[in-house]
């Protein structure tokens, strides 16, 4: 059975920055994302996971289709991760304990900050859309 995940490219338009989370247990920088829960839409999952991991409210930009990253996990399971472009809409009151330190990275530095090549490839596939959104 395919694993479904969703997350956000969370953008601060005023500062032209992108939120990355630092996951201490993996010593990596990533976009906020996570597993789809039962009876949850992919958009709802992206918003919830972003709120849990960053304590920020994500407002999905409906004009852009999600980027779908298909891959196989280290344990051999197929996974599809739907990544939505979203604008930061302020602090969230989410009470999750799954929060990670969140860093607002200047647009030009995101690729260098990401830990894994597959995430750098994802970023390079969407950065022009994000640039059009923040300019």
Residue ranges of predicted features:
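N-terminal strand-loop-strand
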Residues: 1-31
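RNase H-like, metal-dependent ribonuclease domains
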Residues: 9, 121-124
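Residue-level signal for pocket-adjacent positions within structured domains
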Residues: 24-26, 31, 59-62, 109
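Functional cleft and adjacent loop/helix regions within the main domain
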Residues: 32, 38, 127
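Unchanged
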Residues: 36-61, 67-122
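Short secondary-structure capping/turn micro-motifs that flank functional sites
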Residues: 66-67, 130
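C-terminal alpha-helix
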Residues: 125-133
């Amino acid at each position: 059975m395919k694993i479904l995940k969703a997350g956000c490219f969370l953008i601060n338009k005023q500062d032209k920055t992108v939120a990355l989370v630092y996951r201490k247990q993996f010593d990596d920088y990533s976009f906020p994302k996570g597993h789809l829960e039962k009876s949850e839409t992919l958009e709802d999952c992206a918003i919830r996971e972003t709120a849990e991991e960053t304590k920020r409210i994500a407002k999905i930009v409906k004009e852009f289709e999600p980027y779908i990253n298909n891959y196989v996990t280290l344990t051999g399971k197929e996974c599809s991760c739907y990544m939505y472009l979203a604008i930061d809409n302020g602090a969230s009151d989410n009470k999750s304990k799954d929060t990670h330190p969140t860093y607002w990275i200047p647009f030009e530095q995101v690729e260098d900050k990401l830990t894994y090549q597959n995430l750098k490839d994802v970023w390079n596939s969407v950065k022009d859309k994000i640039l059009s959104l923040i300019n």
